[in-house]
């Protein structure tokens, strides 16, 4: 994937370009923004550029052909460390940072990033799901954050500064990523050949995505799409019955299956939908002007009918 295929993040690209041109690349960055907008893709492209073995005049332009570029693309580069929350875990386990009890400080991110680079001139670690770092995990990173090994780069990826521990935020350069526009989400969905059905079009998915590709893909499941609209209808009644409202959410979570992690993800999704509703409600009652490409016509019409003048 080329940089120009990573939509809507030109300002972040230019920021790193300036930092590299001035030889002022920081050791730790915190990428924040809604899920599903390309933060992880951007981090991997940056890693590919920094670990590219080709000689070229533009340090942020990887050749995509050398062994280094190919290994980053395949997530097998010896100087790239990737950490994320396991699917069935509620947090990133401590072992990911300092190894298990038998190999404390001999394995994990903190050990690996301190080793001499094998191929490239840098060691790069990317922590996805930084929202799920607990205090113990953050504390294990303190020495790496305060005394970064020479030539190391650590990128943490989360949804907001508020969800990060203060020990992380205070030691990181913050890079903010904005949601995609609906037209950009539509373009990506169309390129990925997401299949439309009789009830849900790609336009419906893009409009409902809140600028998040992952949300759009999730909503391609008719059950999720219908739940979203049902939830909005209940919230729009001004006084939704507590029992019925709770049952709607619980039934949606339970239908995900037996895995608690899947149920938890659906509860988080329900909370995100509620936030989306009340954001639009505020826009409606304050009559604020908003870019039409970032408004869900269905939700805007619903809130206008229920709460508009």
Question: Model segments located where?
Answer:
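Charged, glycine-rich active-site and insertion segments that engage polyanionic ligands
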Residues: 1-49, 57-60, 150-152, 159-273, ...
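Short, structurally constrained coil/turn elements
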Residues: 74-76, 148, 168
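A short beta-strand motif that forms part of the nucleic acid-binding face
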Residues: 87, 145, 223
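Clamp-loader machinery-focused feature within the broader ASCE/P-loop NTPase space
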Residues: 2-136, 302
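"Short basic amphipathic alpha-helical interaction patches in structured regions
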Residues: 96-97, 142, 169
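Conserved catalytic/switch belt of AAA+ P-loop NTPases
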Residues: 139-153
């Amino acid at each position: 994937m080329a940089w120009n295929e990573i939509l809507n993040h030109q300002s972040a690209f230019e920021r790193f370009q300036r930092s590299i041109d001035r030889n002022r690349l920081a050791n730790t960055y915190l990428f924040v923004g809604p899920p599903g907008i390309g933060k992880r893709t951007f981090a991997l492209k940056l890693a590919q550029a920094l670990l590219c073995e080709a000689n070229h005049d533009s340090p942020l332009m990887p050749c995509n052909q050398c062994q280094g570029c190919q290994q980053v693309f395949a997530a097998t580069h010896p100087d790239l460390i990737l950490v994320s929350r396991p699917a069935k875990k509620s947090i990133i386990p401590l072992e990911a940072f300092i190894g298990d009890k038998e190999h404390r400080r001999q394995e994990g991110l903190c050990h690996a990033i301190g080793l001499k680079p094998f191929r490239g001139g840098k060691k790069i670690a990317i922590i996805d799901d930084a929202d799920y770092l607990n205090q113990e995990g953050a504390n294990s990173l303190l020495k790496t954050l305060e005394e970064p090994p020479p030539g190391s780069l650590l990128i943490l990826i989360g949804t907001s500064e508020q969800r990060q521990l203060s020990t992380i935020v205070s030691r990181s350069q913050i890079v903010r990523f904005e949601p995609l526009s609906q037209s950009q989400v539509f373009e990506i969905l169309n390129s990925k050949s997401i299949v439309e059905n009789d009830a849900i079009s790609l336009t419906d998915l893009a409009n409902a995505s809140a600028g998040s590709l992952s949300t759009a893909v999730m909503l391609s499941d008719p059950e999720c799409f219908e739940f979203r609209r049902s939830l909005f209808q209940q919230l729009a009644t001004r006084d939704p019955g507590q029992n019925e409202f709770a049952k709607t959410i619980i039934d949606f979570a339970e239908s995900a299956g037996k895995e608690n992690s899947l149920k938890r993800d659906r509860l988080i999704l329900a909370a995100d939908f509620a936030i989306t509703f009340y954001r639009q409600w505020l826009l409606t009652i304050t009559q604020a002007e908003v870019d039409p490409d970032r408004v869900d016509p269905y939700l805007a019409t619903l809130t206008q009918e229920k709460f508009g003048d």
